[in-house]
A protein has these predicted regions:
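A conserved amphipathic terminal alpha-helix motif
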Residues: 1-7, 145-178
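Hydrophobic ligand-binding cavity/cleft-lining segments
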Residues: 1-56
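Hydrophobic/aromatic beta-strand elements that line small-molecule binding cavities or substrate pockets
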Residues: 26, 58-61, 90-96, 122-130
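Short beta-edge strand/loop motif at the mouth of beta-sheet-based domains
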Residues: 23, 43-89
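A short, structured loop/turn motif at beta-sheet edges
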Residues: 32-33, 61-66, 95-102, 128-137
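Contiguous, well-ordered beta-strand patches that form the walls/edges
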Residues: 79-84, 91-110, 114
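Beta-strand/loop substructures that line and gate deep hydrophobic ligand-binding cavities in soluble
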Residues: 104-108, 114-160
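Hydrophobic pocket/interface hotspot
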Residues: 35, 45, 69-71, 94, ...
Length: 178
């Protein structure tokens, strides 16, 4: 068996299913309760959501079916060139929640007021959290209305961004008490 590097104890895997669903998987070395809390509480999301060099100064969360998660990220890293100072806004609308096990929401690009940007594709996101030896396996299924919608976000660098985001979550879980 190959030893994984300690900085990334379990790399994220990705695959496309049915030409419009991106499936991401990763093992996080923490309990399902801790990993689920990281996805469901604003104080945790603020610390890790977004790619490296981005902060989340705005994060309002009403974590219940029908509730909304509105967030704003800002690039604070001058080394990111044209992205430095840029803001990116999102709006999640929760559809289903199974405490500790599953979150389903529709993710939209938005503006600072929470208005949906209809020019960019919406995503139906299903997150599952499963206990297994060594931690919690998270599976993220992101489904788009069309193959073109998935291609749009992939061309925007979404896969690199979520890889960095989940790396930040690994680091945050490692720094938090067990």
């Amino acid at each position: 068996m190959t030893q994984l590097p300690s900085a990334h104890p379990s790399p994220m895997t990705s695959r496309v299913e049915d030409s419009r669903t991106l499936v991401l998987e990763r093992l996080f070395r923490a309990s399902p309760e801790r990993v689920f809390a990281a996805f469901s509480q604003a104080e945790h999301l603020r610390r890790w959501w977004g790619p490296r060099g981005w902060e989340m100064p705005v994060c309002t969360l009403d974590f219940r079916p029908g509730g909304r998660w509105h967030y704003g990220m800002k690039c604070t890293d001058p080394a990111q060139g044209q992205f430095f100072g840029m803001e990116s806004w999102g709006l999640g609308v929760y559809r289903e929640i199974e405490d500790g096990a599953r979150i389903v929401y529709t993710d939209y690009f938005s503006d600072a007021q929470g208005g949906i940007d209809e020019a960019l594709p919406a995503t139906l996101v299903e997150l599952t959290f499963t206990a297994q030896e060594g931690g919690t396996r998270v599976v993220n299924r992101s489904t788009y209305a069309s193959e073109e919608g998935l291609k749009t976000v992939l061309d925007m660098g979404m896969l690199q961004g979520i890889t960095e985001t989940w790396d930040r979550l690994v680091e945050g879980l490692g720094a938090a008490p067990a």
